[in-house]
């Protein structure tokens, strides 16, 4: 694989050491700053400085100069203080020992700089301290800096106690056999290198960079161990200590490189194009190159190595990255291991209970070379969503320290098959999906946070801790649940298998299902062993409309001893002491099957012989379990029909057959009616029973439209009515109530014949407003709208038996139709009125006794009567739809009625009347009605 370019890195290895050419073996003598110097060529391209004449004063600091001082071989001389502008190149330790110290705010400025230049040259430049005003000691090299330039040279640069150095570039150990050392130490101590591609630590020789105690280096591209045979070492140590290259870092380019990030230090790469632009770290770049990087801390402070692009461990050479206790390595994109076929890459993630190394990356990618990844207590942390987080790793052993995965709020997938006997831990928010067959991993797995989704096989025991989740469609070992287990895939339904025992220790189970019949799709937890403890189960209905079950929907399968309890945690209501969940028209309870010990969601009555107090008669055999709103909705339709029934003529206006003869006598009337009912339908889906208390007020006017002197007349009328009722509903599925307000109008037309014949026709329109409640589920519907209309015709004839006594046979036919507006109840079930029609015939006979009298000059008339009726219903009652499930109700077809009443009239204008009726269906239902009214003519 082609290596990334070094651009200008090679341009600065060697520069002419003086102002004269040394391209041949010729010698030249010249005067440099008062020193006679001969340039003598030992071999082409390499100068040697020979001092021919100089005075000792040339090397001594100026009198009184305390901030810039030099000793030994420092060129050019003399050293100026406190601010020395060299005007050319600076050499400290050309061929002998030399030191230059810049302290207490002093400054030096030069072109190029050589510290430890030629063979035998030992140079030390120390930059330290600040002045009294806080101004740092400063060294500025406009060109490159070579520390340990030629073979046999040894150079040292020390930047201490807040000193600041700046240069174009830097090379430590430029030639084979040279040694270059840089120490940047102390808060505020800085070395800034301006060129993007030129910072070599061990170019051909040995280079060492040490940054500690808060020192910082800002450089271009960093290369540690550039050429073959070179050796580079970089140690960045201590909190606030930092190396921040504006380009890539190469550790072991062609030579040997080592980078240590320790005790809270920071090393970070980013490109110069913009802040945060990508730059990578290469460890073991080319064939023959060997790089080692270790990130760790013993102080508790986190050491950080970060690349704004990739970390490459073994590009074509040999690379090793170790992230140990207290270390954090970050690859903004990916971490590659052993990329080229010639490479060897080793990634060590180490740690223990006292601290763990962390590699934060988008993914770890296995290359074509020799790959070694040691998961030994360190943490792999994701920094993006990634479906193939361990890319290319078909198998992976887990070392003694264990594998630790931190999804860090991301969605991460791993298809690797793990093996080992230690531990596997899921950390952090987010989801880790394991799809490989890790049956060979027999150690303990802990889900400490976030979600572990197992779609493959994970051997060994599993512990789900509080706040964590285990999900998936695969297989795990014996499981302890302190958190949440949610079988199934991300979408759809599926089963998670626990190959072993299950122990509930405060955890819960989440199940998604499509609530319907026995074959409904559902998530399921399969336990091959035994169960212990109590587990709350939260069931989420995914689009299920409800249906009657037989055996039920199996959600927990237990193959072993089923001693554990699974209890529905999110029931919509409680029935018979069991929480129940509503889907459409049905309620579902979670039950253990007495045969197989597994757990099922069932929409069936579990104890049909034990209805709720006050409930209606349940079905003879266990039937469906309807949700608590259904009996109320059934009763709602029946109540509307009962409240829409039409009265008889005599109930409405009393007995007008005895009004004074003659046309022109119009009238007005008002009546109040009250009733109490107990209705036990002959046909009822829910076995509900209703108790209705009703009050109604009706006011009307009559006008004689035609009349004869013989007493026959045609009377037209119009009445308005208003009423309120309270319905109490009882059912094995749950009790409830309905509060109804109604109003309407009734036009009438009545013919009274002179021979005792009458014919009465009436029509009625009513509008309803109802509030529906369930005792188990609370409010079902407020302000439910409904309407009805009805027609009735009644006819009869009075036959005189003797003076004042008459027998009145009569018959009536009424038709009523009711409908309510459809609505969605609190559970989301659609409730619709399907039909609500009644066609009732009544045949009866009344015995009427009348007496006339006069008192105080006022005519008075009174009559009392009794009536006996037989009623028959010809239609089938009401039918509603609850989530497309038909719910029907019909009262008994045949009823008997007994009524008594009285009229009292005076002054030929006024009358009061009343009637009490009792209706019964001979099977327990009854209605008692009382009405009282006042009528006047004018």
Predicted feature locations:
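C-terminal low-complexity, acidic/polar tails when present
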Residues: 29, 49-55, 114-115, 564-609, ...
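N-terminal segments that cap or nucleate solenoid repeat domains
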Residues: 63-110, 404, 408, 412, ...
